[in-house]
Amino acid sequence: MKISLLPAALLTLSVSAGAAPQMCFDQAGKDYQIDPLLLMSISIKESRLTPGAINGSNRNGTEDVCGMQVNSSHYGKLKNFNITRERLLNDPCICVYTGAWVLAHNFRSYGKNWDSVGMYNTGPSKKLIAQRKAYAQDIKNIYRVLLARKKLLSERLAPAAGKENEIKIAETASLNSGQ
C-alpha cells in the first residue's frame, strides 16, 4: 500500500479518542497491509500501550510521543496531513495510523523484514545495527506471544462454535423431519 494513503485514511476515518484501541490496530493494519498484532507489539514495547506517553530524553534532542512513540523527526511530513503532536497525543487512532505509516515506509524502503521493524526505533543508521537488531528481537518476542495468545483463544472458541453449529444442525434436522 502506498504511503500517500495516510491522508485519505485519516480523512475518512473519523474515530474519536474513545474508540476501542483494538479497532484502531485492526483498521490501520488492514489499510497498510501490516498485521495488527505487529503494530500492537510495537506499541507494547514503545509505551506499554499508553496513549499519552512522552519520551523527551532522546540523545539527538528529538522526542517520541503517543502509544506508538512517533518521533518528532516526522512532524514536518505529518504537518502536511494536519497531524500535530497534540493530535498524536489526544487521538489514539491517529497515533496508531501514524505508527503504521512509519512502519509501512520502512517496509517500502528497506523490505518487509525484521531489520525494517528495528528501524522503527533506530532509523537506518549503520551505526545502530546492534541496537536495531535488539529492538527487532524484542518486537519479535512480543509478537510471538500475541500470536500464541490469539491461537489459544481461537482454539478455545472453536469447539464452542462447533457445538453451536451441531445444535443448529440438529434443530434444523428435527424441523425438516417434522418433529
Q: Predicted segment positions?
A:
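Sec-dependent signal peptide recognition
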Residues: 1-9
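Catalytic glycan-binding domains that act on GlcNAc-containing polysaccharides
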Residues: 18-162
